[in-house]
Amino acid sequence: MSPNILIAYYSFSRNTENFALEIALQTGGELREIVPEQAYSFDYNTATKEVRAEIERGYCPQLISGGEPIDAYDTVFIGSPNWFKSIAPPVLSFLRAHDFSEKTLVPFCTHGGGGFGEIERCIAQECSGARLIPGLAMGGTIDEAELERWLDGIVR
């Protein structure tokens, strides 16, 4: 396992988790799931209402996982679903819980057709002291060849 790479992610429906797992397999990085204290509803329609309300008011939920120190890592992959063109609130909590100065940040996201939306801009805004590498956005299935090409330009 690479001691210098962290893959931190939040996943609602396991799509982002699968993306994070593949990044970990190909980089040897350490996985860290970002888990909010209060889980979202299992009902999709209810969950989307909860998420939209949180995003609109800029809410950052408390985390039960994701607040652990990141000092040992030089490169941090940050994964989020694209929710209403925004970063998932638990990922925003993760960003605000840490100092990313002088770290390399690599965003990745899953989406249902909206690409990155405002996720890269949000990460750049929240982590102004970091070096931001262009990320990768994928729909429901992971294109392993595309992922490998992207990672080749970052960690190999």
Task: Mark where each language-model region is.
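N-terminal beta1-alpha1-beta2 submodule of the flavodoxin-like/Rossmannoid cofactor-binding fold
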Residues: 1-78, 85-87, 92, 96, ...
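Hydrophobic beta-strand segments of well-ordered beta-sheets in folded domains
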Residues: 5, 105-106
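A structural signal for short coil/turn segments at secondary-structure junctions
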Residues: 27, 98, 127-130
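Redox-cofactor binding/interface segments in oxidoreductases and associated redox assembly factors
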Residues: 78-79, 107
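Short glycine-rich anion-binding loops that position phosphate/pyrophosphate groups of nucleotides
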Residues: 81-84, 112
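Short, glycine-/small-residue-rich phosphate/pyrophosphate-handling segment
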Residues: 106-143
